[in-house]
Amino acid sequence: MAASEVAGVVANAPSPPESSSLCASKSDEGLPDGLSTKDSAQKQKNSPLLSVSSQTITKENNRNVHLEHSEQNPGSSAGDTSAAHQVVLGENLIATALCLSGSGSQSDLKDVASTAGEEGDTSLRESLHPVTRSLKAGCHTKQLASRNCSEEKSPQTSILKEGNRDTSLDFRPVVSPANGVEGVRVDQDDDQDSSSLKLSQNIAVQTDFKTADSEVNTDQDIEKNLDKMMTERTLLKERYQEVLDKQRQVENQLQVQLKQLQQRREEEMKNHQEILKAIQDVTIKREETKKKIEKEKKEFLQKEQDLKAEIEKLCEKGRREVWEMELDRLKNQDGEINRNIMEETERAWKAEILSLESRKELLVLKLEEAEKEAELHLTYLKSTPPTLETVRSKQEWETRLNGVRIMKKNVRDQFNSHIQLVRNGAKLSSLPQIPTPTLPPPPSETDFMLQVFQPSPSLAPRMPFSIGQVTMPMVMPSADPRSLSFPILNPALSQPSQPSSPLPGSHGRNSPGLGSLVSPHGPHMPPAASIPPPPGLGGVKASAETPRPQPVDKLEKILEKLLTRFPQCNKAQMTNILQQIKTARTTMAGLTMEELIQLVAARLAEHERVAASTQPLGRIRALFPAPLAQISTPMFLPSAQVSYPGRSSHAPATCKLCLMCQKLVQPSELHPMACTHVLHKECIKFWAQTNTNDTCPFCPTLK
């Protein structure tokens, strides 16, 4: 629509007669529009009224169309805004072009086109193409009019003829006819301007030969734009001034910092020079000191080498003298030591292992006795009605039983560890001494047990024999038998109705006193039937007392003596006991009759203890008034490994075996004893040193 209106405005351009009035202002055509009020007034005078009115109508139509379009499409606000901007810009450019049509030149048209190009709107540029061409046609007409004016021709009426009606419409210049009418040819694009030419084609006709000047304000917003421009100019000046002030401040600060940095640089350079000077001084001193030290080092090294050579000579001389003396002495001792070393080492090793095993058995025996006692009390406590006292006593005995078991396990582990170390070559003296475990006191007595377990003939235990004071024979020597002795049986067992009667007399010289072993019997049962076999001898039935035959050989004599000493046992039981003793000792050689009787008594006491484990002990001994004497079993162990420098000689046929090492004892190596026991001097050496009474380790008899 804007293109058609512009085409209409171009068609209504001033005629040649009107353009004749522009000849006077031909010099002003090259000036830009809006530079001065005089030029604008001259242009306003030269502008035809018809062009101004057409321009105003075109602007109003464009604005109305834009408003109607925005009202019809409210959804496309963003796109319409840009479109409206383009339309307004196009209106301004068209108005400028129309203003330039009267007095502008082709340079002005180029400025308008460049303005549209700067806006970057291709559609607006396309819409300005026909306007530009129309303005070019107007300029061409104005030139023709100026020619006519110069030639002082009479104004003629120019008639624009209508071109062809086909799709490619062109304005061709009309040859001036005889009446003086000239045609104006306007070159336009066939494709872009065909539609606008079809819509409106006007013919300009000069009807009046007079011209009148009129003033029309073609730019009504110039004052507003000037005010706005001045305001923007003021703001820009203020901003420029602020930026300039800030720049000056920054420059001042940078100058101050630069001065400080320069001053600091000078100081650092000065310090650097001083440090370099100090480094040079130190380097010189270091070089001097280094040279001095190297010189002294060379001197000291030379002296050291001389001294070492002298010392080496003296040492070599002394070593040779000592070696010669030692070599003579060692040659004399080497043969003797080599002969004795293996023999004595093996004997000491076996003696240490045997001593450790003996002590372990004795300690475990004591702990097993306490364990059986606790188990018996727990058995009776479990059979009683549960009360507060029984529960408390049960807990105490359970605690005691657990402690005893732990102690027994620890004792076994410690002795086994020591035995293994000795077998691996460790010295017994270097191993720590295994302390004797101390049992805590038993729990306190309660009265309810006496009330519950009353003596009755049906519950009375049957003891095969009663044991008096029996001393356990010793197996191995010990450091201090007094501190290691302990009773095997703490509680005492007896029959409530029939006390035992001891048998007087004991056999053997220097043998400990043995209590008579008498079998209990009642009026209602025969003596033979009331003697059960000792515990641990299962499968061997006690036979009735029968007359024994006379001993035939040495074994029969030994059995006869043992059966006389222990009449409660028969021959089969005694043979079994002797077999157990032989198995435990691996041999019975070297034992005297007194020692054999002691071992048999210990075995019988052990069997009796096992049998007594089925009866109440300790806390319920009031139910069994007949006491069972304790068996005192002191333990003996060597305190250190023994080195034996001596060498055994050839033993005669009358020599006996040592009770410790089980080897023949020469008369010169026999340790004098008050008893008949045979021991090496070296085997009993540490026992004699640690025992103040100098007693035999196998019997408590003094020397």
Curated annotation (Swiss-Prot):
Q: Per the database entry, which stretches of residues form a coiled coil?
A: 220-379
**Ranges where the record places region Disordered:** 1-59, 104-134, 146-197, 486-552
* Keyword annotations: Acetylation, Coiled coil, Metal-binding, Phosphoprotein, Zinc, Zinc-finger
Report which superkingdom the organism of origin falls in. Eukaryota
Q: Where is the composition biased (Polar residues)?
A: 37-59
Zinc-finger (RING-type) residue ranges come to: 658-700
Compositional bias (Low complexity) spans?
493-504
At which residues is N-acetylalanine found? 2
Compositional bias (Pro residues): 523-536
Q: Does the keyword Metal-binding apply?
A: yes
State the protein's name.
RING finger protein 214
Q: Which organism is it from?
A: Homo sapiens
Its encoding gene is what? RNF214
